[in-house]
Amino acid sequence: MKQFFVSMLGALAGIWISVFLFGLLGIIMIGVMAATSASDNTMVTVDSNSVLRITLSGEITDRKQPVNIMNELTGDKPKQYPLNMMIAAIEHAAEDDDIDGIFLDCAGISAGMAQLQALRQALVRFKESGKWIYAYADTYSQGDYFVATAADSIFINPIGMADIHGLSSTTLYFKDMLDKIGVDVQVVKVGTYKSAVEPFMLNQSSEANTRQQQAYLGNIWNEIAGKIAEGRGVDTAAVNSWADSFTFSLETSELAARHIVDRTMYRHETDKILVDATRLEEDDDPRMVDILDYATILSSKKNHGDKTIAVLYAVGDITESGNDGITSDRLVPQILDLAEESDIDGLILRVNSGGGCAYASEQIWEALEQFKSLTGKPYYVSMGDVAASGGYYISCGADRIYAEPVTLTGSIGIFGLIPDAHRLLNDKIGVHTSTVATNRGQFPGLLNAMTPDQRNAMQSYVDRGYELFVKRCAEGRGVSVDSIKAIAEGRVWDGLTASRIGLVDRLGGLDMALADMAAELDAADNYKIKEYPDLKFKWWEEVLNMSSNMKASVVETELGQYAPLYRMARECGHLSALQCRMEYITIH
């Protein structure tokens, strides 16, 4: 009897603890949802003679990001600036009589070159309305400075710094490390320039990869330097001389003498500049409106029109399943659902991806073809910083493809990469294997080197994937297979060159794609935008994914900018290891 009561009390205690924990979790979820809702519904008023303040810090994202429960609970919420909201706010501010000008507060933005170019172009259009832009920084990163050159005047702290250095790329190579630990990487590929596998095979860049990097980095820098020169009223030779001069070491007086900046002043002194520019009383403070607050005001007023354009965001690595990036098991149903929505008049796929799983890329491509054939509605692609390899695969069938001049695209090639750990097991830790099989046709595994027959079969598998990739591109672009092969071979192209060789139709951002589609729909000033995937907070999904997200977050936080290499290595060795992705590089 005593044992019975002990067991019963233990069970009751377990029930009460479970109830308490679920109740606590529910309270936390309600708090998170309430805080999120409150932040979304924060409204501000815009007085006359106001200044739109754009703070270049944190991270620029293509769109507003979904709620991350771990960030909400810990308070670790990095500042994010959705590019689409920023551009819409700048365009509206150009016609808003209450906004006199823009103040760029530069504090080290994290963004891709295509994002920065799109933002800068929006600022240039703002100036064309006759309004002014001023920029200030204690320290200008090169990205900050590129955007700031759209301003009428560039100010800097008297003991500040400006870093203009051109572009360089850095790649880590692991061949010697893998040799030391006894891991061999077995690679089968198609494409002379398909360099994504090189970090596992070589200790330095191949001649072909060096050649392609020099080409696209040079073209991208020429575009950036040209815009900087245009903004500062100098020639590109002057900008290149700045990039060769270690500008970070120059005194601000020298920066002004070289016309890199206009004036030196402390931050508080910019208040007087802005008060004078907005014609306020001398003892007034400038009337600042933060761009995110301003964008929130616009979002409450927009989405009215007879036509609806769907913008579907495809961002990250392409895989078959998972919680992050572009997964075919989530994106394919989304595309097919859009094909059935009668209130959607056109689709723009916004791609920011260096590729991934070839199988998943094909499934997404096919779903988009279904959208076209079932609806007959216009379908465009807008490329972000990168839409290469698998990112180009899912893009190639669009009616029109848009890219920024500095977008990285192309990389039409395929590879398979399978690690062989038998030396690690045998020689390093003394583990041996023995395999008994009924037949020879096994897929290569991690525990043994590929046999000649397996390698031949893998090469045939990769060749077939490459031929299909090329065929998809040729059909989508309306050209011959041979013409695609001439520019394929895994080569990465900058957007400007891609437009010249037929991989891209128009140079411009998402705003241009929207304007062109609206014109095609005869709805230039009468359309609304619906964004997908839906970002509504689903707390049950967050709870279910919390454990896996935490594990991935810890590993990838430690790896930092090299986390993508970890993800690629993790995917290899599976049957879906046929990859169409470009190399991971860090561009400085």
Summary of predicted features, one role per range:
Residues 304-309, 313-343, 461, 533-588:
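Intrinsic disorder and flexible/low-complexity segments
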Residues 50-171, 300-424:
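Cleft-lining beta-strand/loop regions that shape enzyme active-site pockets
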Residues 313-316, 351-353, 383-385, 405-407, ...:
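Active-site proximal loops enriched in glycine and acidic residues that flank catalytic Cys/His/Asp
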